[in-house]
């Protein structure tokens, strides 16, 4: 490949609307160009990277025993009505009509199409298990597309759907796909974590996300120093608290005239923030609920919504709070409520003795409060808080927090989609059985942006070698003035390619500084310079993308540096 015959268009300017490093560098490197909000054209350069990711994903899916298919991107409303997702998916589902006024959607995911295909193709347990995958463009009508291809409306995704007779078989394929994903992200050269996760709108019984670790990540992750435990903070749990100590103080009311937060109350009383309790008032279909967490903790909305009876809860308004507790927000607590209320206590709150709560009296709190003496034992005890950096994990290690970019997700869906679309088989006993499904997604275009977020410096991208558009670029100094240099560079290029390296020749005739800056911006792992001076000395100038300086090497030394 000669770059003089390749479309390569880099820029020095940083676009004003590009917030993330990956967005800025992809635009500057000429990998993508914006067509409309959330819609991007992938240039020849960008497509080379995209195809390399795609190739590794395809190889590992094939290795894992999945078989490739291609579902339509446009899908009929009837399928989505059957699963209830025509309405449930919300505004992200792009809905269209054809000339006959029949309704369709541009699929953001393909559970319905996969289940319908399985219904048509699979009729006996003897055909199971089967795992179908595709690599296809998807569309989600994001309200505010941003961050370039990180949160675009149109994106390239690998999605797979497996079908099984039993839950045990579904679980085996789930583990098989988790192993395949681990191989994929390892081969791509990414620092990643597989974390326990909430199933969200897809649904299902078990779920795990794969995150690329990056400071700019939108998701908070927790992982233990004691094992491979890792989880999204939506689901992460710490070790169980120590057993509750015996009460040692009498309950009494103290004045806190302007102290409405746990931090202010703790400072006024001169006590540890951990001894205070935060009361969060919410409304459910069944009525008013008071959720309690320690003052140094924060309520986890996902966990709280999973407490029986709290699905779909909302924060209570001031009128509702006054009606049930008899006071204004800022002084709320579970003692002496105006009406009977349900109390949901976090595990750490249930383990407290001699704690501090709002008195349900304006300008006052209660100190020395104890369960079973001053108020009944909590009706419900559950883990409803976010974990905190440095606390003890269940495995005995310490929890560490990091930011991550989700690039893959695996689900055990169970039978919900197959049941809705009547995807059944005849089992060993001759009876009709609804198939079990698994679902496994990888954001291929998102991986490209995530890799840049994790691997860059002030000069540009630093690609992991498997993702780089070329592993090596041979740079020619003054190609138009010295045919001998060009000939030597071409000969070197041919040898590199013969040695199994993906290499290109930069014969564009740019000034050396501009050419080298481009190579750094593009993230080329290895740069080799062929010049008249070098040829006279029998050497090539070599520099790895992450090296501080270049070095002069003979051909044997060069190939050794390149691992050949």
UniProtKB/Swiss-Prot annotation:
Catalytic activity: tRNA(Pro) + L-proline + ATP = L-prolyl-tRNA(Pro) + AMP + diphosphate
InterPro entries (alphabetical): aa-tRNA-synt_IIb, aa-tRNA-synth_II, aa-tRNA-synth_II/BPL/LPL, Anticodon-bd, Anticodon-bd_dom_sf, Pro-tRNA-ligase_IIa, Pro-tRNA-synth_IIa_bac-type, Pro-tRNA-Synthase_IIa_type1
One function term, GO molecular function aspect: aminoacyl-tRNA deacylase activity
SUPFAM superfamilies named in the record: Class II aaRS ABD-related, Class II aaRS and biotin synthetases, YbaK/ProRS associated domain
Location in or out of the cell: Cytoplasm
Origin species: Xanthomonas oryzae pv. oryzae (strain KACC10331 / KXO85)
GO cellular component: cytosol
CDD domains: ProRS-INS (cd04334), ProRS_anticodon_short (cd00861), ProRS_core_prok (cd00779)
Protein name in UniProt: Proline--tRNA ligase
PANTHER family, per database record: MITOCHONDRIAL RIBOSOME PROTEIN L39/PROLYL-TRNA LIGASE FAMILY MEMBER (PTHR42753), PROLINE--TRNA LIGASE (PTHR42753:SF2)
Key words, A-Z: Aminoacyl-tRNA synthetase, ATP-binding, Cytoplasm, Ligase, Nucleotide-binding, Protein biosynthesis
Function according to Swiss-Prot or TrEMBL: Catalyzes the attachment of proline to tRNA(Pro) in a two-step reaction: proline is first activated by ATP to form Pro-AMP and then transferred to the acceptor end of tRNA(Pro). As ProRS can inadvertently accommodate and process non-cognate amino acids such as alanine and cysteine, to avoid such errors it has two additional distinct editing activities against alanine. One activity is designated as 'pretransfer' editing and involves the tRNA(Pro)-independent hydrolysis of activated Ala-AMP.
Broad class of the protein's primary localization: cytoplasm
Domain text: Consists of three domains: the N-terminal catalytic domain, the editing domain and the C-terminal anticodon-binding domain.
Subunit and interaction comment: Homodimer.
Keyword Ligase found: yes
GO terms (BP aspect): prolyl-tRNA aminoacylation
EC number of this enzyme: 6.1.1.15
Gene: proS
Family indicated by similarity: Belongs to the class-II aminoacyl-tRNA synthetase family. ProS type 1 subfamily.
Pfam name, any one: tRNA-synt_2b
């Amino acid at each position: 490949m000669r770059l003089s015959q390749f479309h390569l268009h880099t820029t020095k300017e940083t676009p004003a609307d590009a917030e993330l490093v990956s967005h800025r560098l992809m635009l500057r490197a000429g990998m993508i160009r914006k067509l409309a909000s959330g819609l991007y054209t992938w240039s020849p350069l960008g497509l080379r990277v995209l195809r390399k990711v795609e190739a590794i994903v395809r190889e590992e899916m094939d290795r894992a025993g999945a078989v490739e298919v291609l579902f339509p991107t446009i899908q009929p409303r009837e399928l989505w009505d059957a699963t209830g997702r025509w309405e449930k998916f919300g505004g992200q589902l792009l809905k269209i009509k054809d000339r006959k006024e029949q309704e369709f959607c541009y699929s953001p995911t393909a559970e319905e199409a996969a289940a319908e295909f399985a219904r048509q193709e699979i009729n006996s347990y003897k055909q199971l298990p089967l795992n179908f995958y595709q690599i296809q463009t998807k569309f989600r009508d994001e309200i505010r597309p941003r961050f370039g291809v990180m949160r675009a409306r149109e994106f390239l995704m690998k999605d797979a759907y497996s079908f099984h007779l039993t839950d045990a078989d579904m679980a085996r394929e789930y583990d098989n796909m988790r192993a395949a994903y681990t191989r994929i992200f390892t081969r791509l050269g990414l620092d990643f974590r597989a974390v326990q996760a909430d199933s969200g709108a897809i649904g299902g019984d078990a779920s795990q996300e794969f995150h690329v670790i990056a400071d700019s990540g939108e998701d908070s992750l927790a992982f233990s120093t004691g094992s491979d435990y890792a989880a999204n903070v939506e689901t992460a749990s710490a070790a169980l608290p120590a057993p509750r100590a015996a009460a040692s103080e009498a309950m009494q009311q103290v004045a806190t005239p302007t102290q409405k937060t746990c931090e202010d109350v703790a400072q006024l009383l001169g006590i540890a923030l951990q001894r205070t309790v935060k009361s969060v008032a919410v409304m459910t279909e069944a009525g008013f609920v008071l959720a309690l967490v320690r003052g140094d903790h924060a309520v986890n909305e996902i966990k709280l919504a999973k407490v029986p009876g709290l699905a779909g809860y909302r924060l209570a308004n001031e009128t509702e709070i006054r009606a049930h507790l008899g006071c204004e927000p800022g002084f709320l607590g579970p003692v002496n409520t105006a009406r009977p209320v349900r109390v949901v206590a976090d595990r750490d709150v249930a383990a407290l003795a001699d704690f501090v709560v709002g008195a349900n009296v304006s300008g006052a709190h209660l100190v020395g409060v104890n369960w079973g003496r001053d108020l009944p034992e909590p009706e419900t005890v559950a883990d409803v808080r976010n974990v905190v950096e440095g606390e003890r994990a269940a495995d005995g290690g310490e929890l560490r927090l990091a930011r991550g970019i989700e690039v893959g997700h695996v689900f055990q869906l169970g039978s919900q989609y197959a049941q809705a679309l009547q995807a059944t088989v005849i089992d060993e006993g001759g009876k009709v059985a609804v198939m079990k499904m698994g679902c496994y997604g990888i954001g291929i275009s998102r991986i490209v942006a995530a890799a840049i977020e994790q691997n860059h410096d002030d000069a540009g991208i630093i690609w992991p070698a498997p993702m780089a558009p070329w592993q090596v670029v041979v740079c020619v100094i003054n190609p138009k003035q010295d045919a001998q240099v060009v000939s030597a560079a071409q000969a070197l290029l041919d040898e590199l390619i013969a040695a199994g390296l993906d290499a290109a020749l930069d014969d564009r005739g740019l000034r050396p500084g501009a050419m080298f800056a481009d190579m750094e911006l593009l993230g080329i792992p290895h740069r080799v310079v062929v010049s008249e001076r070098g040829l006279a000395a029998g050497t090539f100038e070599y520099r790895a993308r992450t090296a501080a300086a270049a070095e002069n090497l003979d051909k044997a030394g060069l190939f050794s540096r390149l691992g050949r």
